[in-house]
Amino acid sequence: MKKQIITLMCATALLSSCHIYKSYDRPEDITTAGLYRDTVAGGDTLVADTANFGNLPWREVFTDPKLQALIEQALTSSPDIRIAALKVKEAQAPLLASKLAFIPALTLSPQGTVSSWDKGKATQTYSLPVTASWQIDLFGQLLNLKRQAQATLEQTKAYEQNTRVQLIANTANLYYTLLMLDRQLEITEGTAEILKKNTETMEAMKESGIYNTTEAAVEQSRAAYAQVQASLPDIRTNIREIENSLCLLLGEPAHAIERGILEEQQLPSDFSAGIPLQLLSNRPDVKAAEQALASAYYNTNVARSNFYPRITLSGSAGWTNSAGAAIVNPAKLLASAVASLTQPIFQNGANIAKLKIAKAQQEEAQIQFQTTLLNAGNEVSNALGQYQACSQKVEARNMEVNSAKNAADYTKELFNLGTSTYLEVLSAQQSYLSAQLSEVSDTFSRMQAVISLYQALGGGREQ
């Protein structure tokens, strides 16, 4: 009867612990539908796309050779990427330890003594015992600890990939910022040169008395020239600061950056965002959030396993030249084996508290995972909308620049014919300058939208 009761208790414990062995599965209530909005339909999820812009290797997105060289250098030398790689190594150590927990632990404890009685001949005894202990993972504690360590390692790898994506995006952003500032500097310097010549012309016209040129007109010309000249130091300072920021990203002292020109840049313009489920496998932060949830799931299983018995097998073997009262040589082999079972009965509520904490942490991780998904979809929606808006602005701005240029040319011709004032010439010239600078800014914003979309879709692959 006693044997039957023990058998029944063991069977009950085994059946109730079966779910502890289950691997993590994504919860069914995690929402992946409607993560981001179609910029055409305005409200529905893009489900028809099969190609995914985020799957493109970064070299196919950023084709400027100088930018590619900078990105390669950043991925090799950046302090951030080196720290991320070290974190992966740190996470590999607990995983190795959790795997070795399945192997018996061995301990060697050599001992030796020298003794003498009544000034007699000294006798020497020694023993070389080797002790082994092995925990039988009957209720899944070691298995879940190993799975938790594996999930933590995958989470750290996702963090490393996320660092790569951010480095690529930040390097591209800073590089294109330099190209934008270079173009703005070029436009502003060209305008300043035109205004300088206009001022010299106005001064000569006043001296010659042509078209009744007044001192006020000359001063207006000088003021316009000085205003444009005053903006040049700010642009040059911005260029220097962006170069320094890019050098810092590369882990180098500040220096000038070799680069191309804005007009030569070609970025993708036809995007397939992919179905929302692809965000789960593409975005590193989504991967990391799900691995954090998996880690919390296994931690809950570990907390559950604390309620079940622990069975440990231990044994020892060794050699000794001591056998009771007699001192003998050569050494003899000694061996023993023990099996023990530890069943928690009363732990002052510690195990219950640990389980409650683990369950709460698992729920927190699930909420964080869902929030990360929503944030990913929001970033994709914003990047798509930003690109569409910037494309429309660039198209309209091109028309503005053409019209402003024509207006400036016509006004200058009318002034030369004496049918327009110099104030009108200045106004037209300033409008043209403003339109050109805005066009450059809008072009850069569109490039930023491409980078943001690529990053939001988890881009950054090597191949």
Located regions from the model:
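Sec-dependent N-terminal signal peptides
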Residues: 5-13
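Acidic, low-complexity, intrinsically disordered peripheral segments
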Residues: 7, 19-23, 267, 437-463
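C-terminal motif of bacterial Sec signal peptides marking the signal peptidase cleavage site
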Residues: 15-17
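Bacterial Sec-pathway N-terminal export signals of envelope proteins
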Residues: 19-94, 182, 215, 264-294, ...
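Short, solvent-exposed, mixed-charge loop/turn linkers that connect secondary-structure elements
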Residues: 49, 193, 210-214, 218, ...
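Small/polar (Gly/Ser/Thr/Ala-rich) solvent-exposed segments
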Residues: 82, 102-123, 133-164, 182, ...
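Amphipathic alpha-helical coiled-coil segments
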Residues: 84-98, 163, 167-187, 197, ...
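Hydrophobic, lipid-facing positions within transmembrane beta-strands of outer-membrane proteins
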Residues: 126-132, 275, 335-339
